[in-house]
Swiss-Prot record:
This is Wings apart-like protein homolog. It comes from Homo sapiens (Human). Pfam families: WAPL. One of its GO terms (biological process) is cell division. A motif (FGF motif 1) lies at residues 73-75.
Length: 1190
């Protein structure tokens, strides 16, 4: 047939009236519709040689409308249904038959249906059914795209005796009649059962070959199932891949694309005996499928009819006419249920109600995408037919509803999709409402518009759908193996041309549909291919029929975005036919592989374009790569820069190391483990980079917090002190918190008791000391005694390293509050005590260095910190001042003993003697210690009357300080004399500024004159030469005059250098000459002598500059010493007229102007350099003012 089909209903007592009745009654070959006239023609077919005549009659399964909605194109809605346009299709070669006999056949079928208890056995011999071609055009016709349209029954019943199950169906009818009031809510569940029920039409041998039509009906509900119990289950057409909420594998196959096998009588009897049980189970499931969801199978296209039913299932509900028809047919179905008509399409109750119509879908509805799939059954049905007998009769083409009802007890249902079926299908196939109008016919093709065949919607969901299909097919396979009744299989010989088996072959034909349709979306085809790949070999053994010759070219359709080679179907196996029909003249009748060669391998990179689904969206284009090609296209995103990677690696390495080491420092670990972990951490900290990481991550405090109990263990305390010492080497560890500082001070308190040493194994202690010694050798250890490594020594060195001038006020405060200053003062006292006892030079040097380091700490914490100054003055009754005074006296004695001034006189070529090395070593330690002592005393007496008084009370301290100004510098190298002299003068100024007692003591003191005063007097005036003891004031005035004269002399020399600066010499390279009234420059010839002379002059200029700098330095030193001496004399004159008179006596002409001029220069210099605080400048200004009024 070439028209779209109307609907014929078989009624009680008469034939249905429809468009087909009009055609058959008028004996016309045209059918008038709104779209024109459709011409169809039936032709005779040929006998098929392999046909087996003895096929048993199979009970025909009628369909009864029992639900609330009837068929959309029932006799009540025939006039209202939209007519179908006829297409100019290729004519089908059919068996011609008389239309009168067709009408008679229809009546006969109706009577058979009403009888309901008879099974007519028809032996069909040499019945030839020609293949039908399925054009593409009428697949989706706009709003008329209704997949529920059903073909006239009489077209297929004309020459067939319908086989009807009779004996045991009345019980089922009664049960179903009771349950016919159930409303099936899950509309989409109809799509869960992709199997298309087919009724088998047996062709009568006496009549001509019938017109090639076939009945295929989609079960409206679970009650409408094939009457053969044990039929083959299949999961091939699991369209739920495309409908997200549909999951079912209850596809029941009772037939194959091969010819029907002979059904054995005993098998058929067994199926009839189990019918009641299946019917009872099926009634329970009948409420799960609504009536308005149908899929109809087309006729006699063995490759496509099964696919048509399933494809129609996809198209179901897409047209508006269908909705209208469903609403009308729902009334019909309800009336039929009330009338008690045939229930569930399985049994009839007398002649009550209307029999279920049989529908044959138009072939054009099946070839939508022009794809031919020929071996889907072979590749995908093996696992569902394992338990079926290999040689069953024609009854195997029928499927009882009871079979599915039995299997559905294990079926899991998913909630229905929230989208309407129309929306789902439109999304899947990309159809738009405005594109679904009727289209004009063409030969073998359709003109409707398809938007990308739905591929843009499938690319993202195929993976998920494949997984679901895999799981469901496995479940279906298990259920099939455990089915109680065997499935029926058709014989292989009588499939293609037998009209008796046309309805039965719909299932098998539809199974082949998806591979043969060119445009079937891959998401529909993909699960079939995967399932078929697993079962290909087994299916070939079971469904082994004669191969048919190809009817048309095959194109393996596949999704362009997922061209997986392993998922593409193999070359389809074409089964031989006695009569082949071509869709068009362009289709070759030769082997498929010869027509279309294998497609070229897909490109490695796939370009995907996502079409926007909503307005105001942009098209998204992306490049994708298949998983198997990933090795060729390695895409690395967010690549870090090289420096970032290195930094990340360093941070990760540091994190791993510190976590590992911290785990070994915990108190729960054994003592030896903790010691080794501390030494390992100290070894890491020897690298500056690791120390940097440790501080950057704030791990120093965490480490010392873990080692808080280390002072209780001698060896662990030693390791902890070594770790502190290593961390202090870069002098950047100012981030110590209070706890760490407290631990450091507690380590200072540890005493090296002999008793505690005995508690520890001496051998282990020596090992630890050796490791620490080797570790300390790798870092700066100038003041560390490697031979005497103790906890206190390491802790003290650490503390001294940390207390630089950069230490903040918080550090100074915490050190005092935690008791750190107490330990340092005690350490100073201890070192000073050793100075008087130690005769060994090495021990002497150690004591001197120890005292010097402690005093450096005290000096740094007392600068501009009155709190610490007062604390140290009061601590243990000025213990620090007493110890400092004693130490200063010892250093004065030692500096004379270890005179380093003589070493500077040694010849340059002579090697230093051994005693000179010792002298230099000890002498330097003494110098450093003296400077540290005076520095601490300066801070304690600065603007502090209490400190000045306490310091001045110390015996011999003022005399010692005066000697440091006048006598000590001669025992020091030239470069060290200025420093010690200025420090002594500063100490004397602080002592006499706020203390009248100290002023009185200094004025009444006698001392020797300055060591260099005699030298200066020898060069100058003899009146300045003084010998023996003199008053301190006289010695200080003499020093002032000498330094002031030296400064003037240096200044005059500097002025001479400036005056004698080379002037611009006359250019001797030429001369100006006047010739003929013009002045011209005439150059002279250069000689080598002039060039050498020029170089010599440049060298002389450099020497003069260096001399000028040296004179300026000497001048500055002399000016500062003279200024400090003048300030000291001015302080002595304050509030003491006697002292003013004394000083005036020693000044030239008794004039203080020379002193005030020097102080004014010094004040201006101090203001420029901001070297001292405002307090010193105020003091200088006060003294200047006082002297000017004297």
């Amino acid at each position: 047939m070439t028209s779209r089909f109307g609907k014929t209903y078989s009624r009680k007592g008469g034939n249905g009236s429809s468009k087909f009745d009009e055609v058959f009654s008028n004996k016309r070959t045209t059918l008038s519709t709104k779209w024109g006239e459709t011409t169809f023609m039936a032709k005779l077919g040929q006998k098929r040689p392999n046909f087996k005549p003895d096929i048993q009659e199979i009970p025909k399964k009628p369909k009864v409308e029992e639900e609330s909605t009837g068929d959309p194109f029932g006799f009540d809605s025939d006039d209202e249904s939209l007519p179908v346009s006829s297409k100019n299709l290729a004519q089908v070669k059919c068996s011609s038959y008389s239309e009168s006999s067709e009408a008679a056949q229809l009546e006969e079928v109706t009577s058979v249906l009403e009888a309901n208890s008879k099974i007519s056995h028809v032996v069909v011999e040499d019945t030839v059914v020609s293949d039908k071609c399925f054009p593409l055009e009428d697949t989706l016709l706009g709003k008329e795209k209704s997949t529920n349209r059903i073909v006239e029954d009489d077209a297929s019943i004309s020459s067939c005796n319908k086989l009807i199950t009779s004996d045991k169906v009345e019980n089922f009818h009664e049960e179903h009649e009771k349950n016919s009031h159930h409303i099936h809510k899950n509309a989409d569940d109809s799509t869960k059962k992709p199997n298309a029920e087919t009724t088998v039409a047996s062709e009568i041998k006496e009549t001509n070959d019938t017109w090639n039509s076939q009945f295929g009906k989609r079960p409206e509900s679970p009650s409408e199932i094939s009457p053969i119990k044990g039929s083959v289950r299949t999961g091939l057409f699991e369209w739920d891949n495309d409908f997200e909420d549909i999951r079912s594998e209850d596809c029941i196959l009772s037939l194959d694309s091969d010819p029907l096998l002979e059904m054995k009588d005993d098998d058929f009897k067994n199926r009839l005996e189990n019918l009641n049980e299946a019917i009872e189970e099926d009634i329970v499931q009948s409420v799960l499928r609504p009536t308005n969801c149908r899929t109809y199978c087309r006729a006699n296209k063995t490759k496509s009819s099964q696919g048509a039913s399933n494809f129609d299932k996809l198209m179901d509900g897409t047209s508006q006419a269908l909705a209208k028809a469903n609403s009308e047919s729902s009334k019909d179905g309800l009336n039929q249920a009330k009338k008690g008509g045939v229930s569930c399409g399985t049994s009839f109750r007398g002649t009550v109600g209307r029999t279920r119509d049989y529908t044959v879908l138009h072939p054009s509805c099946l070839s939508v995408c022009n794809v031919t799939i020929q071996d889907t059954m072979e590749r995908s049905m093996d696992e569902f037919t394992a338990s079926t007998p290999a040689d069953l009769g024609e009854a195997g083409r029928l499927r009882k509803k009871a079979d599915i009802a039995t299997s559905k007890t294990t079926t899991r249902f998913r909630p229905s999709n929230t989208k309407s079926k129309k929306d789902v299908k439109l999304e899947f196939f990309g159809f738009e409402d405005h594109e679904t109008g009727g289209d004009e016919g063409g030969s073998g093709s359709s003109n409707y518009k398809i938007k990308y065949f739905g591929f843009d919607d499938l690319s993202e969901s195929e993976d998920d759908e494949d997984d679901d299909c895999q799981v469901e097919r496995k479940t279906s396979k298990k259920r099939t193996k455990t089915a109680p009744s065997p499935s029926l299989q058709p014989p292989p010989e009588s499939n293609d041309n037998s009209q008796d088996s046309q309805s039965g072959t719909n299932n098998a034909e539809n199974l082949d549909f998806t591979e043969d349709l060119p445009g079937v979306p891959e998401s529909v085809k993909k699960p079939i291919n995967k399932q078929g790949d697993k079962s290909k070999e087994n299916t070939r053994k079971i469904f082994s029929g004669p191969k048919r010759s190809p009817t048309k070219a095959v194109y393996n359709a596949r999704h362009w975005n997922h061209p997986d080679s392993e998922e593409l179907p193999g070359p389809p196996v074409v089964k031989p036919q006695s009569v082949t029909v071509r869709l068009s003249s362009k289709e070759p009748n030769q082997k498929d592989d010869g027509v279309f060669k294998a497609p070229a391998p897909p490109s490695k990179v796939i370009k995907t374009v996502t079409i926007p689904t909503q307005p105001y969206q942009d098209i998204v284009t992306a490049l994708k790569c298949r998983r198997e090609d990933k090795e060729l296209y390695t895409v690395v995103q967010h690549v870090k820069h090289f420096n970032d990677v290195v930094e990340f690696g360093e941070n990760q390495e540091f994190t791993d190391d510190i976590e590992y080491l911290l785990s070994g420092l915990k108190s729960t670990q054994p003592l030896n483990t903790r010691c080794l972990s501390v030494i390992s951490l100290a070894t890491k900290c020897a690298m500056p980079s690791f120390r940097m990481h440790l501080r950057a991550h704030g791990m120093v405090a965490m480490v010392f917090k873990t080692l808080d109990d280390s002072q209780h263990h001698q060896n662990l305390s030693l390791c902890t002190a070594a770790l502190m010492y290593i961390l202090s080497r870069d002098r950047l560890n100012m981030d110590l918190d209070r706890a760490s500082l407290d631990l450091m001070i507690r380590l200072l308190e540890l005493e090296q008791d002999a008793s505690s040493a005995k508690l520890l194994n001496e051998k282990d202690m020596n090992k630890i000391k050796e490791k620490i010694r080797r570790l300390c050798e790798t870092v700066h250890n100038k003041h560390l005694d490697l031979e005497n490594i103790t906890t206190g020594h390491l802790a003290m060195e650490t503390l001294l390293s940390l207390t630089s001038k950069r230490a903040g006020d918080w550090f100074k405060e915490e050190l005092r509050l935690l008791g750190g200053l107490d330990h340092i003062v005690d350490k100073v006292k201890e070192c000073v005590d050793h100075l008087s006892r130690d005769e060994d030079e090495e021990k002497l040097v150690a004591s001197l260095w120890g005292a010097e380091r402690c005093l450096r700490v005290l000096e740094s914490v007392t600068v501009h910190n009155p709190e610490n100054q007062s604390y140290l003055i009061a601590y243990k009754d000025s213990q620090l001042i007493v110890s400092s005074a004693k130490a200063l006296q010892h250093c004065e004695e030692l500096i004379q003993q270890y005179n380093r001034a003589e070493d500077s006189i040694c010849l340059a070529d002579s090697k230093p003697l051994p005693h000179q090395n010792v002298t230099n070593h000890v002498g330097k330690a003494v110098e450093d210690c003296m400077r540290a002592i005076i520095g601490v005393l300066l801070n304690l007496t600065n603007d502090n009357e209490w400190g000045s008084t306490k310091t001045g009370e110390q015996d011999g301290l003022i005399g010692t300080a005066l000697n440091c100004v006048l006598q000590v510098p001669k025992y020091l190298p030239q470069e060290q004399r200025f420093d010690i002299r200025v420090l002594g003068l500063g100490l004397l100024i602080n002592l006499v500024e706020y203390s009248a007692r100290n002023r009185h003591c200094l004025v009444n003191m006698e001392t020797s004159c300055s060591f260099d005063s005699s030298i200066c007097s020898g060069e100058g005036d003899d009146s300045l030469r003084i010998g023996g003891q003199v008053h301190a004031v006289q010695a200080l005035v003499q020093l002032f005059l000498e330094r002031e004269r030296a400064a003037q002399l240096a200044e005059s020399k500097t002025d001479e250098l400036i005056k004698d600066a080379p002037t611009t010499q006359h250019d001797k390279s030429g001369e100006w000459q006047e010739t003929s009234g013009e002045i011209q420059w005439v150059s002279t010839e250069k000689t080598d002598g002039t060039e050498e002379k020029h170089k010599k002059e440049e060298e002389d200029e450099e020497l003069d500059l260096n001399k000028a700098l040296q004179h300026a330095g000497k001048h500055m030193e002399d000016c500062i010493v003279a200024s400090y001496t003048a300030l000291l004399l001015g302080c002595l004159c304050q509030e003491s007229p006697i002292n003013v008179t004394t000083v005036r006596e020693y000044l030239p002409e008794g004039d203080f102007s020379i002193m005030t001029e020097m102080l004014k220069k010094f004040l201006s210099f101090m203001n420029l350099t901001c070297a001292v605080g405002t307090t010193g400048q105020k003091s200088i200004s006060r003294v200047i003012e006082y002297l000017e009024h004297c």
